[in-house]
Amino acid sequence: MFSSRILRWDLTAISADQNQRKPRKTTLLDCRAMRQTTMMKAAAAASFLMSVGFADGALAQATRNVPTPESVLGKRPGDDFYLANYDESRAYFKKLAEASDRVRLINVGKTTRGLDWEIAIISAPENLATLDRYKKISQKLADGRGLDDAAARALAREGKAIVHLDGGLHSTEVAGAQHSILLAHRLASAQGDPEVDAILKNVIVMLWPTLNPDGQNAVTAWYRKNLGTVYEVSPLPDLYQEYVGHDNNRDGYMNNMVESQAVTRTELEWAPVIFYCHHQTAPFPTRIFIPPFVEPISGNIHPLMGRWLNVLGMNIAAYLDARGMPGAVHRVGFDNWYPGFLDYTHIFRNSISFFTETALYRYATPRFYSVDEFPADQRNLTAGVMYASPWKGGWWRLKDAVEYMEGASMAVLDTAAKFREELLFNRYQAARDNVSAFTNGPPYAYVIPARQRDLGEAATLVEKLMVNGIEVHQAGKPFHASGVEHPAGSFVVLMDQPFSPLVKELFETQKYPELRESPNGPPIRPYDVTGWTLPLQMGVHVAPVLQPVSAAERAALTRVAKFAPPAGRVEGAGVSYVFSHRPNASFKAINALFAAGAQVGFVSAEIDMAEGRETGAIAASGVSRDTVEKIARESSLSVKAVAVPKGVVGVKKARVGLYRSWTANIDEGWTRWILENYGFAPVTLRNDSIQGGNLRERFDAIILPDASAKSIRDGFGPGILPGEYTGGLGSQGAAALREFVQAGGTLIAFNNASLYAIEDLGLPVKNVLAGLKPEEFYCSGCLLRVDIQDESHSASWGLPREPVVMFEGGPALEPGEGFVGRVLASYPKNQSPLMSGYLLHGEKLQGKAAAIEVQQGRGRVYLLAFRPQWRGQSHGTYKFFMNAIYESQGLSNPSSPKPAGATPTPPDKKG
């Protein structure tokens, strides 16, 4: 049977490192040859869902005035070789809402690319008539405060189960958005169907046609363009969400993307008791993965939420099996340790949040599977406890995936209808218990002191909490907690609130359990990262309060009703404006000053600033005070107007190029989003842009986002994508980058892109982790401490002495023979660098370099062997690459670098 972890994916996505495909018994030509036969069968297949027994064997009769999907779209979602895009889906939902009194559309905002985003609220007409009442009941039960058990029980008895269902986040997982159309039609049109009647009476369905409208349009357009060609099932060469692609499901608590913000805002408004998101694909050869998940789970999840999650999973499997739909599997491959999944973060707000993974071939192209293709241990079709009805192979079509998804959605709605009152009351119990737990035990609160190295990032952390529905207070006078006095203006998060588990999940350090395939075997691979402690990532000091907060201290706190960033200001008189390098916002200000026509430089001498003595402060002149005051307000910076300081090294606005391959690199998207937000205006560099050379004439700095050396060098191989999207930088691109650096340019490589720079630019640096087996060294993503080795170097300006970096599958570096440059940051020599998460044999890192500057000719290569901008969360390490961007402009002297082995500046204490 299945290992609890080992997955056998059915060609879900092709990366640049997976160019060699195994030949398939059923070819794309076979599929196209069957298209005519398939289309002839489409009409007969269209009524499958109604005939397989979803309503106890009776056909659900549609009212005449409710349009069928076919009547609006011209095709039935699920048909072979057909995908409806978002615009078409939206048009159908509009027709449905016009025709049915069970459907109401609401606008939840706009997408990144400016599409209007609407979702359907589906329930009985009498429920829709009093929708605000049911929303208020759900909100009261989700909060729990001000209710006793009797009052909560009465509300649960009166209320309706609000259930979130959606068409998925990941647009290449195409079945979800097609299923939404059919599910909406069924709920809007069914007559004489007891199951649907019970759902409409007891449940209010929040049906999101898709959680990624932009991506649905992009993927559908790509498929239609290639349909009938040899590239029919080729992967999309660009991100299907403008900036983050697949990581749109890693943004659950940060809410960086506008789509994430819309989902979180809407969920807080409606307070659904269940949040169910559809994904693809299932571990092969199973047809659908359903919770329970594999170990481990967070201890911050209320047990009732976990119990109901498992109940829903088992009910889905039973529902499908009862209707002749085999292949459901549990406890294989997917854990939910990381809380940042957009479809899971809500469980820390006591909403039963989960996902399923339904089998996928590619797009709407069918595929035949024989048992001979199954993994050897699956060919005997033996049933197991968590795989009770093995799938026996055969054709798998988009229609099949759509039907499994509709069945799963109906099972969830059926469960919600039958257990409406208990679900609502249990959610109240979870909120009640959370308040009680932190009323009577630590941590009683967390303090975010007003005195911070980067107050702007502390304020950003507060904003992130508030967007997640967390209540934050501010101290009107010095706040005493656990024997420590925090200054007035400090933020306080009292933990006796219903969503406190999310605060604890984000603020505490993670201790991932030791899980191995065998006592001496390799570690079991987590599904995602193991450590994410947000204050550590953002470089913000947060203090837990371990004694009860007194009534007097509470009285001095004021609830922050609406987030407002710290007030920026300009003080003093003078022709030069100076501000600290320590806040990340200083880079926003630099770029805004350039846009205003100012002259900008860095003060290479140590000077007195409000935050203390500092090297690398920023000085600006040639701009009006009004302009500086506006920029200070927008950047929340304290600026001093002074006489022109000594030692200013003038710079010009950096010209930044960002490499963007045709492999849909998520790290590139995150990098682009951050650079744009900070005003750098990066220029996209495709393969041919770099191969054309003359880069130094156009750019000061070029960034290579995280990717394998092979992916950067080779890209997709021939035959996988149309020719214009194949290949990587190749030898011509490597030569152009070498020329760029030799001519004085700065090349900045993130994480594994460092290995590309080492290999293809011939850098005398080695990866000390190369060749190690997982049992010899393992880190799936955790937070590690590094020590800054040379605080006087401009690449280190503004950084604390001991920043915390996100290490995720990258190298650890060591200078080799002939090295000329500097080690900028190293892992501590005499202790484990682990701060949060799981690290096996961390001694392999001790004393090794995490960030290196290598000199080549008149330029530099920066090797950042970690994720300095990981998912838009690791704000505390942004300066590693933002500082490096300006290195081509003479901030440090390349003619006198420290040789390898020189004694570094020892860190004495945290800065």
Predicted regions and their residues:
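Sec/Tat signal peptide C-region and signal peptidase I cleavage site
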Residues: 54-60
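Short, low-complexity, charge-dense intrinsically disordered segments
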Residues: 4, 10-24, 30-33
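Mobile, glycine- and charge-enriched loop segments
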Residues: 200-257
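Sec-dependent signal peptide recognition
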Residues: 35-45
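Intrinsic-disorder/low-complexity accessory segments
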Residues: 61-204, 244, 250, 256, ...
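Bacterial N-terminal signal peptides
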Residues: 43-53
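Proline-aspartate-enriched helix->loop->beta-strand connector
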Residues: 267-281
